[in-house]
UniProtKB/Swiss-Prot annotation:
Any matching Pfam family: CTP_transf_like
Catalytic activity, as annotated: nicotinate beta-D-ribonucleotide + ATP + H(+) = deamido-NAD(+) + diphosphate
Organism: Maridesulfovibrio salexigens (strain ATCC 14822 / DSM 2638 / NCIMB 8403 / VKM B-1763) (Desulfovibrio salexigens)
Protein name in the entry: Probable nicotinate-nucleotide adenylyltransferase
Pathway per the UniProt entry: Cofactor biosynthesis; NAD(+) biosynthesis; deamido-NAD(+) from nicotinate D-ribonucleotide: step 1/1
Keywords noted in UniProt: ATP-binding, NAD, Nucleotide-binding, Nucleotidyltransferase, Pyridine nucleotide biosynthesis, Transferase
InterPro entries according to UniProt: Cyt_trans-like, NadD/NMNAT, Rossmann-like_a/b/a_fold
């Protein structure tokens, strides 16, 4: 089984998140893509970040009825702060027979080598970098070779790692919607039903009092 892990704060989840998850699911022939909402912030102010439980609930609403999409509590159920490498290790424990695909934004490549245990990430999972349609794939290719000098290009926007895992760049997404935009529109009292899945918009309306505690 091929499982994609799509991590993020999802504060809140929106339609572009679903587009990315569905796009990766179909392009790479995965069996499932699991959204992995981040846990509550540790040792810092919560700010506009909704509680982990509420963000998880909104993602659950978003993927309900979406074939191939699901949500995981790997990060929100962890005791203490979580890092990508820890998330992947826990996913490997939960899904021992699965081939894992870690989905991240292309901009994360710039800080990838600062992540805890980053060298272990491509040993635990294939890496999928998603980007805008107009992104410079040539520059991204050079960045990949800088981070992983041993990579060998094995196809268009596909690189083979030394240990057998692959790195994919999928760059045809439209990122016009952001969580920041959704929050700002919601705070202004505007309809966000064209920015988030219908079930998410309904849940946000039902839990308006809870949202107001964070989105002021």
């Amino acid at each position: 089984m091929k499982i994609g892990l799509f991590g993020g704060s999802f504060n809140p989840v929106h339609l572009t998140h679903l587009d990315v998850a569905n796009g990766v699911l179909k392009r790479l022939g995965l069996d499932k893509v699991l959204f992995v909402p981040a846990g509550n912030p540790y040792h810092k102010e919560q700010g506009e970040m909704l509680s982990a439980e509420l963000r998880y609930e909104l993602v659950k609403k978003a993927v309900q009825g979406c074939s191939g999409l699901g949500v995981s509590d790997i990060d929100i159920s962890a005791d203490g702060p979580t890092y990508t490498v820890d998330t992947l290790r826990e996913a490997s424990r939960r899904y021992p027979d699965a081939e894992l695909y870690f989905i991240m934004g292309q901009d994360s490549l710039e800080t990838f080598t600062t992540w805890k245990g980053w060298q272990s990430i491509p040993e635990l999972a294939n890496v999928v970098a998603v980007s805008r349609a107009e992104a410079d794939h040539g520059a991204m290719s050079q960045e990949l070779k800088r981070i992983f000098p041993e990579v060998v290009e094995s196809g268009q926007d596909v690189w083979q790692m030394k240990g057998g895992k692959s790195i994919y760049i999928i760059g045809d997404f439209d990122f016009v919607i952001s969580s920041t935009l959704v929050r700002e529109e919601w705070k202004k009292g505007r309809d966000v039903s064209k920015l988030v899945p219908k079930a998410v918009a309904e849940c946000m309306n039902e839990k308006g009092d809870k949202l107001k505690k964070f989105w002021r």
